[in-house]
Amino acid sequence: MFCVQCEQTIRTPAGNGCSYAQGMCGKTAETSDLQDLLIAALQGLSAWAVKAREYGIINHDVDNFAPRSFFSTLTNVNFDSPRIVGYAREAIALREALKAQCLSVDANAHCDNPMADLQLVSDDLGELQRQAAEFTPNKDKAAIGENILGLRLLCLYGLKGAAAYMEHAHVLGQYDNDIYAQYHKIMAWLGTWPADMNALLECAMEIGQMNFKVMSILDAGETTKYGHPTPTQVNVKATEGKCILISGHDLKDLYNLLEQTEGTGVNVYTHGEMLPAHGYPELRKFKHLVGNYGSGWQNQQVEFARFPGPIVMTSNCIIDPTVGSYDDRIWTRSIVGWPGVSHLEGDDFGPVIAQAQQMAGFPYSEIPHLITVGFGRQTLLGAADTLIDLVSREKLRHIFLVGGCDGARGERNYFTDFATSVPDDCLILTLACGKYRFNKLEFGDIEGLPRLVDAGQCNDAYSAIILAVTLAEKLGCGVNDLPLSLVLSWFEQKAIVILLTLLSLGVKNIVTGPTAPGFFTPDLLAVLNEKFGLRSVTTVEEDMKQLLSA
């Protein structure tokens, strides 16, 4: 086992990365190794997808499957070894079908990629785990050095984050052939074990640029189906009655669940990154979508244990449900998996609803506590002139984007302290689950404009980018000249690709933490600092002083 993709990874003087029987996330060495094998199979599939496009062949089954199954290897998504192997077998079957299509056009068609002809050696998980050793990401570290390995992983993990957003967009009916062609090209190239530093840096920026397009079609998918988010108050306390909790990012799953629970007497609560769903008109129209439950994903083992109903996980983040003894009432969807947990194959939530009706639910309604969400792209752009007016009248000094992933490290209190230290004449724009560090606090307003503005899920960084570009255009300056600072928390691969997206668009002087990714070497950090001004957090006082004086 070697895995260094998330913030929790083991860090020692000898090196970084989980490399024992179990990773810090709870992933076993077996599952981790089999995920490496799956990635190799997917690289071979992408190699043939690139070749097929040379013949004008576009196989939508391949395009749909490839990023979805890659998403299953993201942190806290799928811990189920047999399902990971199943994805690998499906990847090889699709590859062979695609290869046959190519050969039907050109009898001499071939693919030079080292992963292009990968076959699984056995049905036995132990044998497959031994085979996976050929594909462990650090297998040639001694030959290439830590810097090249770090850049490879930056590209691999960044592409994994983009694949997750591609799947979210695909579920909503969005498809862009250029994006998929670019994805396959990059995935196939990474399967050649590249070792050129400049080429890898260019690839990282290409992934960021591609992801901006992915976020654009994801935004289109969400707003076309569910309307543009508008500011909406959400209750974060319990309402009397039977209940279901839904977590993750998949708004379509939430919509289906709301449709199927309507009139059943079962209330639905959002959790984690589902919180922004309350801002969408076509979702909040369901009156039994009664509120948001819980806090950051890392607290779920305590909070889920207390929830008096079933829980549905639609994407990341799931952690060991046996710890809180709620494994008999947590359900996984799509690419999510945990051994022994019930999995919903289709869109029928009937078994979950039946379980909810058999449980007690909340015995009484608590005194409501309302927070506001729903500052989506359209709302933000509508406020652009107001922001400019406030800046021109010196009523608004600075905007801080404080957001990103949450996590369990104590150092993450930095983001709570930072938000509460923001001066009263400054605005906080937030997104993703890092907001749970401070989104239930009171921040007041500036002439009626809330000082805390919740822009949505992690992918809604797209809305923040569009707002920044619009403000810069209206003010006749560059984005980096705006009174705007980005203070970002990272945990996993979606955050990595958001960072690459921002860097690829030329956004500079981003502050990130609480720690640097374990695959960032000192040399790589120095390059990113020199080129983009990227740096790690220090203290709230020092960072605030520096950002306000920039």
UniProtKB/Swiss-Prot annotation:
Q: Where does hybrid [4Fe-2O-2S] cluster bind?
A: H249, E273, C317, C405, C433, C458, E492, K494
Q: Which UniProt keywords apply?
A: 2Fe-2S, Cytoplasm, Iron, Iron-sulfur, Metal-binding, Oxidoreductase
InterPro entries, per database record: HCP/CODH, Hydroxylam_reduct, Prismane-like_a/b-sand, Prismane-like_sf, Prismane_a-bundle
Coiled coil stretches, renumbered: none
Molecular function terms from GO: 2 iron, 2 sulfur cluster binding; hydroxylamine reductase activity; metal ion binding; peroxidase activity
What biological-process terms (Gene Ontology) are attached? response to hydrogen peroxide
Chain sites annotated for binding [2Fe-2S] cluster: C3, C6, C18, C25
This entry carries the following GO cellular component terms, namely: cytoplasm
**Which locations, inside or outside the cell, does it occupy?**
Cytoplasm
Q: How is the cofactor bound?
A: Binds 1 [2Fe-2S] cluster. Binds 1 hybrid [4Fe-2O-2S] cluster.
Q: Which residues carry this modification: Cysteine persulfide?
A: C405
Name the EC number(s). Answer: 1.7.99.1
Q: Does the keyword Membrane apply?
A: no
Q: Which cofactor does it need?
A: [2Fe-2S] cluster; hybrid [4Fe-2O-2S] cluster
Q: Which family does it belong to?
A: Belongs to the HCP family.
Role of this protein: Catalyzes the reduction of hydroxylamine to form NH(3) and H(2)O.
Q: What is this protein called?
A: Hydroxylamine reductase
The record lists the organism as Salmonella gallinarum (strain 287/91 / NCTC 13346)
| Name of the gene encoding the protein in the UniProt record | hcp
